[in-house]
């Protein structure tokens, strides 16, 4: 009788490395380790040999970067999705795609179970398991970190040494870090005190604003229907554009975010993020929308932006609601074509200009010069009708 197979999300870190051995023994199963490339800079070249040496029977490496940018990041950007008006959702966006890759591998390999290495206290367990349930409800889900016997990192290292599991964890960084091309999340250590300023060693890619260049950097970003397509006049792929903006923004100290956020599981947490490209692109995209969207659409879309951000953050990417909102968002983005010029300087963003063939700004109507074509006399009748309801109310209720 053949053994059952378990597909696991594998990063090569301490937790997922010992998870292979632990699951293999507990369930007498074969382990299929799956790693997705979402643009993280972390070493990924030797993961296959490490997974096999740890006890996996198979390994799948999936380059998800193009799909991540085109089907996840750009959707979130067009939606204006910033969780609680700050977080550009880098980790939250990556989880459903990674979970989808694990499901695909599990189905291809004939697995009967899925496993992840998330703790029982965070958001990611929700994102993985809700996605698993959405895409493969017939597969059993395992969460070893919620049930295994290890109560400390030291205990995990001891287990690894006992079973000759190759891990490099000998000195722990004080921070927990997750990274993909859209941003980096940093937590734990001294960051758990919300009154402690983040030490410089917490930041992974951004230059301290104080040490950033004394001369500003100016970038021109061109959008077509809400999607960035060129940088400084050079057409490039979404992946290349994000990588370049990450580099340029980081060098200028742009993209450092510090927030107290409300987790899915009901607690508040202090999070530090680095997201240079995301910060710049959200800023530029919003300014282009101000120029091209009709007033009521622009104002109403802000509500949709928050709803969309909540859907992503709460792990509901594959929900009918997200698909329904996409239809509205795609309609709003049809006129969002044009160029935005942004100045980057010592951690700050400044808008220098914007232009669009679909601009709703009419200089002849807006000007106060002799070129003015606005009918000033029409304002009297408009104001009379606009305030008529309140005038009538006050006449009936004089005491108010």
UniProtKB/Swiss-Prot annotation:
It is found in: Cytoplasm. The keyword Ligase applies. One of its GO terms (molecular function) is ATP binding. Coiled coil: none annotated. Pathway: Amino-acid biosynthesis; L-arginine biosynthesis; L-arginine from L-ornithine and carbamoyl phosphate: step 2/3. Its EC number is 6.3.4.5. One of its GO terms (biological process) is L-arginine biosynthetic process. It catalyses: L-citrulline + L-aspartate + ATP = 2-(N(omega)-L-arginino)succinate + AMP + diphosphate + H(+). L-aspartate binds at residues 119, 123-124. Its main location: cytoplasm. Signal peptide: none annotated. GO terms for cellular component: cytoplasm. L-citrulline binds at residues 87, 123, 127, 176, 185, 261, 273. Belongs to the argininosuccinate synthase family. Type 1 subfamily. This is Argininosuccinate synthase. The gene is argG.
